Amino acid sequence: MRILVRGGSIAAGVGVSRGYADLLRERYAPLGVEVVNRSRPGETSFDAVETFAADIEPHRPDILVVHFGIDDAFSSVYRSEFKENLVRIVRLARRRLSAAVVLPTSHLLPDPHERAAVDVYYRTIREVAADLACEMVPVHTAWAGYCTDRGPAGSAFLQADPRLPDEEGHGLYATFLAVRLDRLL
């Protein structure tokens, strides 16, 4: 069994020594599940479509985690393009690999204007997941619930650049994703 993570800066673990893909690898290795991370800093959904044959297909994942949104939002990828790219990735994964596809959102951003900008992308992820029967992991809502229950400030679990989670934030990502991944394994 193989899980492949394909995303941008967050999935690549920018700014931390162990990102959520590393934590998932540690969690699932004893079960014989391989976790491969083919994410790169700053990449958008356009990059994932363009490199599907090189980054995803050769690994033949059983589960594909497609984690884009924040880099797209701040790289001027239009919402319509983002949606089209996600649809293309899902269809390629199903046609060429028969892989289950997991679409996570990202964390809440503390700045209300930036949060509103990425919320459009999170809604798009929800639409694609519903339309194409993918597994969606609403990290942003789980994150909000976690912070509400435990009382940390909105910028808790984030690096100096609030678009990136810190090590503890990556732990939250891994926890939220594992709930869905456990059901697929």
Spans of model-derived segments:
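Serine-esterase "nucleophile elbow" of acetyl-processing enzymes
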Residues: M1-P41, F46, T51-R60
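Alpha-helical cap/lid subdomain in secreted, periplasmic
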Residues: D22-L31, V49-L185
